[in-house]
Amino acid sequence: MTDRLVPQDSARTTGTRLRVLGAGACALFALAACAPPGGGSAPAASEAAPTDVSTELGEEPVELTLYDGAGLKAKDEALIAAFEEKYPNVTITGRYDPDDVQAQNSPRVLASDDPPDIARVIALSDVAGDGLLTNLDAYADAYNWDELPEGQLAQYRVNEDGVRGEGSQYTLADGFTVTGFYYNKELAQQLGMTTPPQTMDELQDLLAQAEEAGMVPIMAGNQTGGIVFTTQMMLNNALGAEAVNEWVFHAPEATIDTPEAAEAVGTVQDWAEAGYYPEDTNGTDATTALGRFANDEALFFFSGNWDAAALDEQMGDNVGFFLPPAPEGSEQATMSDPASNFAIPAGADEKDAAAAFLNFLRSEEARQVVADAGFAPSGEGEIPTTEEGSVNAQIQEAFAQLVEADGQVQFVQNATNGLTTTWNSEVQRLVDGATSPEDLLAAVQRQYESELGR
């Protein structure tokens, strides 16, 4: 979720800093808009759902094309280089559109007469329903992709009714974003915080102490939806990761307009009234909030891995990261979307080789490349090597905990194409006291159902 990206090299432990996801946290990964497919004939059913597949690439030269957003080029090119080193008979050429149009262009690219062999997909339900993607079930069986964490597999599946999280597999991601609390270690020490809070009660005690000490408890740029993050944190805790994901995935009769959700959103309103966010949060954007946090103006900053490089550079050892505390008796959960959710277009010529690339994304080599790029890696395995003590190292450890807890949750803003605007505006009104938790949730649910035609 960003408008500035990604690494320029893959150094692991040197002082070189990767330009990872920038502070404008709501552009690239929230681009869910999807234009109608363009020209090109619909693929045959046998192309869209192959059954005769192979995991062998042979020795003959194979040429593939990969399609993604330009901001992810450095990560992709590093993955391509690692794959080509392992499979020297395969050559992959990257093709990139500007980030702000890749989502709109993607359906036309997928439907063209000469589609790429590998393509990043955002609006999975739409393009799978249009028959533009290869059903990967046969490859999933061949490569044992069912061994992937269930929370990740859910992000790759869609059923015949367009409900995500179940049905056939159509994608496999190279890595993920991960969200949580950054904290200023020096300010934390002033409050007696020596380790991250383990419970919501401990977190709220720290917020109260910070406010009493004259600190800003949570820095947030709510002009660009910063408080939507803590709003979803409370919803994740109140409803559970599975229920929130079902809502984002369009499960039948799913609703977020419940008494439990209203109570959760009410806590966010209470925090605003208590002064736990900046007074000017609704007039502050994500980039400004990042800079103010880095300038020691707040104890906490809820954001994601896209801000790690900037904070590491500006704050050094003074910044830490932790996942949101879970309710008693529950597993940790937080927002974590795919970086590049790769599919194989139905009209692709080299499906077996493309599937081999998708499978490669689970390898230790690929996981290291993705971690070097500032993302959390796909699948499970050893935590990739990172600079000891860096905030990226803390993020990688936190993501490993999240995967073990099966706590990856989709961003609620991405449930439909138009919901980012609704969430942002309604949470701004909540902070201003211009709406209630109940009215906020009703407005969001109306927009959700309107876009889904329910």
Language-model features, listed with the residues they occupy:
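Conserved N-terminal structural module of periplasmic/extracytoplasmic solute-binding proteins
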Residues: 2-130, 328-329, 369, 443-454
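Extracytoplasmic/periplasmic substrate-recognition and gating elements
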Residues: 85, 167, 189-191, 274, ...
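Hinge/lid segment of periplasmic solute-binding proteins
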Residues: 124-179, 320-322
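Short, solvent-exposed loop/beta-turn-alpha elements that line the ligand-binding surface or hinge
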Residues: 137-153, 222, 239-263, 313-314, ...
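Long, aromatic- and glycine/proline-rich binding clefts that accommodate carbohydrate-like moieties
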Residues: 151-154, 322, 372-421, 429
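Extracytoplasmic/periplasmic solute-binding protein
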Residues: 166-174, 179, 204-253, 298
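Conserved C-terminal helix/tail region of periplasmic/extracytoplasmic solute-binding proteins
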Residues: 189, 403-454
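Glycine-centered hinge/linker elements that transmit conformational signals in sensory
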Residues: 207, 250-281
